C-alpha cells in the first residue's frame, strides 16, 4: 500500500487568511464538507470534525504539532471505518501574496478504505479552501452537495453517530 499522499494548491491570498480558514473553530467549514472543527490545538489534545448539531462525528484525531500560521499536524481516523489513525501534515508557505498549501497524508499501513477515500477528497477540499479564501464561497456545485448532505444527514453511517464512537463515549 502507498505510504503517503501529497496534495498541493496555490491560493492568491496572504498566509494568515488561508490559515484562518483551515483552523476555523466551532463554525461550519464549507471546504471541509460542511463539518465543524472542535479542538484547542494543543499537542496531545483531541480534535474532531463533526456535524453542526454535534450528533455525528466524522473524523477523530489528535493534535501533534501546531505552529501558526505555517504548520498543523494531526492524526486522522474516519469514525465509520474500523481502521487505525493515519497522519495529516498541513504546511503553508507564502511567496509574493500567494500561499502554497501542501497536505501530506501518510502512515497508511492497513488503512485501504481511508487511503482510497482521501485520495480524491483532499483534491476537493483544497479546491474548496482556495475558492472560499479567494471568492468568499465554495463553488456552486459544492453548495448543492452540501445542501443534499445536510438534508440526508440522517442516512449517514451509524458509525458516525457520536454515541457510537468509542473514544467519545465519556464525553457524550
Which residues make up each language-model segment?
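Generic structural detector for well-ordered beta-strands
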Residues: 8-12, 48-50, 62, 91
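Hydrophobic ligand-binding cavity/cleft-lining segments
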Residues: 1-38, 164-172
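Short coil-to-beta transition motif at edge beta-strands of beta-rich domains
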Residues: 41-47
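Hydrophobic-ligand binding "helix-grip"
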Residues: 37-38, 53-111
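Residues that act as N-cap/strand-start positions at coil-to-secondary-structure junctions
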Residues: 3, 33, 43, 57, ...
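Hydrophobic pocket/interface hotspot
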Residues: 18-22, 28, 47-49, 63, ...
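Terminal "cap-and-tail" regions of soluble proteins that handle hydrophobic small molecules
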Residues: 95-172
Amino acid at each position: 500500500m502507498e505510504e503517503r499522499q501529497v496534495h498541493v494548491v496555490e491560493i492568491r491570498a496572504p498566509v494568515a487568511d488561508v490559515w484562518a480558514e483551515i483552523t476555523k473553530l466551532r463554525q461550519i467549514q464549507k471546504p471541509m464538507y460542511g463539518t465543524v472543527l472542535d479542538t484547542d490545538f494543543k499537542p496531545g489534545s483531541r480534535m474532531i470534525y463533526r456535524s453542526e448539531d454535534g450528533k455525528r462525528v466524522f473524523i477523530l484525531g489528535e493534535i501533534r504539532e501546531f505552529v501558526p500560521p505555517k504548520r498543523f499536524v494531526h492524526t486522522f481516523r474516519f469514525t465509520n471505518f474500523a481502521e487505525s489513525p493515519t497522519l495529516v501534515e498541513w504546511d503553508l508557505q507564502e511567496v509574493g501574496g500567494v500561499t502554497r498549501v501542501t497536505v501530506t497524508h501518510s502512515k497508511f499501513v492497513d488503512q485501504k478504505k481511508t487511503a482510497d477515500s482521501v485520495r480524491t477528497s483532499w483534491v476537493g477540499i483544497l479546491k474548496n479552501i482556495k475558492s472560499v479564501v479567494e471568492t468568499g464561497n465554495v463553488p456552486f456545485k459544492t453548495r448543492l452537495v452540501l445542501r443534499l448532505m445536510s438534508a440526508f444527514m440522517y442516512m449517514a453511517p451509524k458509525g458516525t453517530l457520536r454515541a457510537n464512537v468509542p473514544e467519545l463515549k465519556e464525553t457524550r
